[in-house]
Amino acid sequence: MISLFSYSKNPVKQWGQLQVKGNQLCDQTGDPIVLRGVSYGWHNLWPRFYNKQSVKWLKKDWKCTVLRAAMGTVIEDNYIENPEFALKCMNKVIKAAIKNDLYIIIDWHTYYPQKEEAKAFFSMMAQKYGKYPHIIYEIYNEPMEDSWESVKEYATDIISEIRKYDPDNII
């Protein structure tokens, strides 16, 4: 019962490199854990929250152990139209999560595959942040009208790209 309500002040230091065993998220020793946290809204709709102060506050006040940085690929100022702005927002939160010893989900938040753009993005993220055990990749947030075959093909390609640079973090 204690593990259900446990909180880690420094989750990455305590749990280390995450792994999946069966259907369980586990710490570096193979013990099941539960991460607790929140998702930022799309970077292009709520950029004012993409800063180090919000990360620190969510850790301290909400006792988060994980955050999710949702990078929008549709609507104005999205990654496809304005990658510099998107990366600036994402990098602020990712760097702050690492500094504050939190896990961070890098989320490709879209309704459409955009495979080539996603491959380039995740290649960049894996090269930059793949050495940190804080990272979790979410490669396609909301497939809407895609067939299983197309989602599987997309996922296989994106996972292969990430694994070129990051063999360990959870996807």
Predicted feature residues:
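Bacterial Sec-dependent N-terminal signal peptides
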Residues: 1-9
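Active-site mouth of glycoside hydrolases
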Residues: 11-170
